[in-house]
Amino acid sequence: MAESIKQKPARLAGPGLPDFRNLGVMLRVLLVVNLLALLTVALRADDAGRLAADLALMAGRVELPLLLAVLLLYLLGPALRRLHARAGQAAVFAVASLAVMISSPLTGADAPALLRALAWSWLAAAITLLYFDYRNWRFTPALAEARLMALTARIRPHFF
């Protein structure tokens, strides 16, 4: 007896990239990176009076590369989805690096500042990708349970 296509369980999502064309994903990327910038400023602050000024400086350094990276990830979204998981993650790091390098002439950064910005962007990209992997891992059991409940609801009328 052949199985119905609808009854075959869908392959659960493994480690991979989120859909960078989704507005929710874009919002989460912006929030995670901005929270990391806020945390960086809070950890580095010596004086509470300079916290607002340091936060404004950090926002000036972070926002342009961040928006550029989100735009590039949006444009490259379909190509990134076709890549293997590790290659896609490497491409995200490359996009983050490219965004920093493109925006660095506008900020007038010297070589050490550029290296710090690249390192910070790699750290932010790694934490953001880890967040999406963790989120995917947490939702996987819920999806399997929802599929089982839907199947049970379809079968129940035949037996009661």
Model-derived regions: residue spans:
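Conserved HAMP-HisKA connector
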Residues: 136-159
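Hydrophobic alpha-helices of bacterial signal-transduction systems
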Residues: 1-140
